[in-house]
């Protein structure tokens, strides 16, 4: 009876470790194919918040404060690099255009990423916090 209880406890413990390891691994994976919203308030007079969407092949669409931008993102472990591509030419208020330029510059300066709870941190000279969009 005692041997059976020890064996059962060991089996349950092993299953728990396997499930925990799988969950931890899932938490570490980069969130390809998810819309990631910049953790920021909309600018005055707008409801728009920047959104980052990255495909598994690294192509990305970044909706900035006014325009959108194409990019190529390379993820290797915790390292990440972002190469900016074409940016839209929609006319914007000067402060929104400046915010686009500032965010684009911060994104291309990112060198690593990690999860902080439910938030994705893109880390460079300036840390950018994104959260997965939930509907």
Residue ranges, per PLM feature:
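Lipid interaction determinants
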Residues: 2-12, 20-135
